[in-house]
Amino acid sequence: MKNTLALTLLLALISMNAMSHSQPQAQSDTVVVTTSMGTITIALFEKQAPVSTRNFLAYVDSGFYGGLIFHPVIPGFMIQGGGFLKNMTKRQPILPPIKNESDNGLNNERGTLSMARTQDPNSATSQFFVNLVDNEALDISSRGLGYAVFGKVISGMDIVDKIAQVKTGSVGPFNDVPVQPVIIISAKRK
């Protein structure tokens, strides 16, 4: 009887451990981004992307994102924010570039939030983007580091999709600029 009970408990523990690995990764801080088109709520993956999460929260806590626009906006790909005012003046980052965390096991799937960067993999600062589709080409691969996922939209994906459908054009050297700016009014921890 004791052996049966011990075996049952062991199997239950193994089963619980397996179930915990199949559950979505733990989410920590939540950020509410209020835009001129509606509200987007984002859960951040601090455990998997601690550097990107701390960086993003530092910008959020400083009020940096208020007044910035979404640009570029590319239907079927992504919407990006965190860098430009509506007159297309770049707001200079307040923190140094961060280490690329695209090797964290998270993929650029629809609704995920990732760090934008230049060709230099370790150049991400304030700009981020929301994937509109699964963008496997942005994940880490044999070609090198990808774009680090550090969060996911948990409410307001309909707003993200509406932003993706706005009419865009060119402003100076910039393409995919919304004709009617989509403004980030605020980004705050929930």
Model-derived features: positions:
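Positively charged n-region of N-terminal signal peptides that target proteins for export
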Residues: M1-T4
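Bacterial N-terminal signal peptides
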Residues: A6-M16
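Cyclophilin-like peptidyl-prolyl cis-trans isomerases
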Residues: M16-K190
